[in-house]
């Protein structure tokens, strides 16, 4: 557990040095996290309600269709911004989803916009109460 905390702290230090802000949110690799980790790490675990599988199929059309299919009220959609085809698919999907009435928000805004206070040690996957908002 100490190694995991040390790795997270090192990464957070780098991000804080570059941005001036310490990250509070973490997506565990592959979504794998256990209750001990949830309760011993000082961060909010943000997972996802659906995935574009862009790590598996690097095709813009496939990713675009997954975004359009999975965009639902309160959804958190997993994507990887290091893939050019994913960025292209997102840029294509955003205007269409906005026309459908969706708003794009930061994941912490999505999870707290109904007055809920985020809790450490809880793996968040979506916001079941929200209407018309989605986070990527």
Where are these regions (language model features)?
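Catalytic domains of cell-wall/extracellular-matrix polysaccharide-remodeling enzymes
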Residues: 1-122
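C-terminal accessory extensions appended to soluble enzyme cores
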Residues: 117-136
